[in-house]
């Protein structure tokens, strides 16, 4: 009798990465009745981000093969340090807990089940050491795009093979020729900020170095979206197998992630959208960490009022703690221009938390001012909503560059904006970007609608991502 296989997934904490992990687990379980999955859950020690509510909701999710998936909560660790280095160290501090959890799993597994390997988040490469200790293969789940993955490999090779100090790119006018991009990359403008830090940059590039030790990389993208980047990775003899398996999205059960209070907020928002004409509303939302200072908030408000376009604006206040998530305002008037809410009462709606998927799916929404996180990008493409790019941190500037210059699926508000730069984006630039993204008969809108159809076909039987996922399943059976 053929043995069942079990995969151990290790995502980083944060709702975006956990949701993506569960969604790819669902796809795998639906494709192989002889597969079991365990997901090890790390938690941030500060403000909750909805992960607990989401995981509890999975018990009643009809699309989940609950008898073949389980969640193991790891003991909570303290977050010491700040910035990227503090975050990476926090992830690595869970190694002993992961080792204990896997040891218990191996002691209790039945003789008819074999552990087929670790599937680690893109920032969990320290867990490769544990996989090696247990004699198990490891795979990477890369939750960003293929072009960004190619950039990581490129920068790592510059450091390790050409002895290049990547921090020198910070104030340079260098343009990088990277095989996963068609156009040269303006380094100072779009490289992830962490690359410009000596310690954090080395941490970051070591991830790519360690990817090369694994058996393959699952990438949350699809062939039709990034054909050049995927081809460049596939033809590079130094890079292990890459499996484009996206878009990995939680499009069917977003409502399960929210409390009853947020469910009421969601209903109010959707009722307001129901009263708006088709494709007439621009949606502004900047992700789970997205927030601005008062000066920038006022520039956005002036742009919206002057532009006269219907808007739905997710406006959140910065955390009062050094490390933490943005929260909802108790009074928007404290930060908005005087009289703004009264003057725009028939034009738009200001909200706090936003049910992003439900909003993007609504026919009234015609454009999305976005931080260009990869999940948000894929969601916008899935629903055929053009993007105006306003990145904050991490790989978001790279994503914005790819969307605007490479894929022609977005317009620019400020592609090189960085959250901690102190730069204020002008109301004129904001208004211009919003008007461009909201053009009804534009070539951009046509391209995004076409890509939306391709994103859905990729996951259908015999679609590009469906086939790629099948190749991965074949790989774990033979490893």
From Swiss-Prot:
Cited CDD domains: GT1_Gtf-like (cd03784)
Region annotation Disordered: where it falls in the sequence: 454-479
Designated gene of the protein: GT6
UniProt tissue specificity: Strongly expressed in achenes, with lower expression levels detected in receptacles.
Known catalytic reactions: a flavonol + UDP-alpha-D-glucose = a flavonol 3-O-beta-D-glucoside + UDP + H(+)
Enzyme Commission code(s) on record: 2.4.1.91
Annotated keywords: Glycosyltransferase, Transferase
Pfam families: UDPGT
Residue numbers binding an anthocyanidin: 17, 394
Record's protein name: UDP-glucose flavonoid 3-O-glucosyltransferase 6
Acetylation as UniProt keyword: no
Biological role stated in the UniProt entry: Broad spectrum multifunctional glucosyltransferase. Catalyzes the formation of flavonol 3-O-glucosides during fruit ripening. Accepted substrates include several flavonoids, hydroxycoumarins and beta-naphthols. Uses UDP-Glc as a sugar donor, but not UDP-Gal or UDP-GlcUA. May also be involved in detoxification of xenobiotics.
């Amino acid at each position: 009798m053929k043995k069942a296989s079990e995969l151990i997934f290790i995502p980083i904490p944060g709702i975006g990465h956990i949701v993506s992990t569960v969604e790819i687990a669902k796809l795998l379980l639906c494709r192989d009745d002889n597969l079991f999955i365990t997901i090890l859950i790390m938690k941030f020690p500060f403000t909750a981000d909805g992960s607990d509510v989401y995981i509890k909701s999975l018990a009643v999710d009809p699309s989940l093969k609950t008898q073949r998936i389980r969640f193991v909560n790891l003991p909570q660790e303290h977050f010491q340090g700040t910035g990227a280095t503090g975050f990476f160290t926090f992830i690595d501090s869970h190694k002993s807990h992961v080792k204990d959890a896997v040891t218990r799993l191996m002691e209790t597994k039945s003789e008819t089940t074999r552990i087929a390997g670790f599937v680690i988040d893109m920032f969990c490469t320290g867990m490769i050491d544990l996989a090696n200790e247990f004699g198990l293969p490891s795979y990477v789940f890369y939750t960003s795009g293929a072009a960004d993955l190619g950039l990581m490999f490129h920068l790592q090779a510059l450091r390790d093979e050409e002895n290049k100090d990547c921090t020198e790119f910070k104030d340079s006018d260098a343009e990088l020729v990277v095989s996963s991009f068609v156009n040269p990359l303006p380094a100072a403008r779009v490289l992830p900020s962490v690359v410009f830090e000596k310690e954090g940059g080395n941490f970051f590039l070591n991830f790519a170095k360690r990817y090369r030790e694994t058996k393959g990389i699952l990438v949350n993208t699809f062939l039709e979206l990034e054909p050049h980047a995927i081809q460049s990775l596939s033809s590079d003899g130094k890079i292990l197998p890459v499996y484009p398996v996206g878009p990995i999205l939680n499009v069917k059960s977003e409502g399960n992630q929210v409390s009853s209070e947020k469910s009421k907020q969601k209903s109010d928002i959707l009722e307001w959208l129901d009263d708006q004409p088709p494709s007439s509303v621009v949606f502004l939302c900047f992700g789970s960490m997205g927030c601005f200072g008062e000066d920038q908030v006022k520039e956005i408000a002036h742009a919206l009022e002057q532009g006269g376009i219907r808007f739905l604006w997710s406006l959140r206040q910065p955390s009062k703690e050094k490390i933490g998530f943005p929260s909802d305002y108790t009074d928007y008037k404290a930060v908005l221009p005087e009289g703004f809410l009264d003057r725009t009462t028939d034009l738009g709606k200001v909200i706090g938390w936003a049910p992003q998927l439900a909003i993007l799916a609504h026919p009234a929404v015609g454009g999305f001012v976005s931080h260009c996180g990869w999940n948000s990008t894929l969601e916008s493409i899935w629903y055929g909503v053009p993007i105006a790019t306003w990145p904050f941190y991490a790989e978001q500037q790279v994503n914005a560059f790819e969307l605007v210059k490479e894929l022609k699926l977005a317009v620019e508000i400020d592609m090189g904006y960085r959250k901690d730069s102190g730069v204020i984006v002008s109301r004129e630039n904001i208004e211009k970007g919003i008007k461009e993204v909201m053009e009804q008969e534009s070539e951009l809108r046509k391209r995004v609608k076409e890509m939306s159809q391709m994103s859905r076909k990729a996951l259908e039987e015999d679609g590009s991502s469906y086939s790629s996922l099948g190749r991965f399943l074949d790989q774990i059976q033979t490893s």
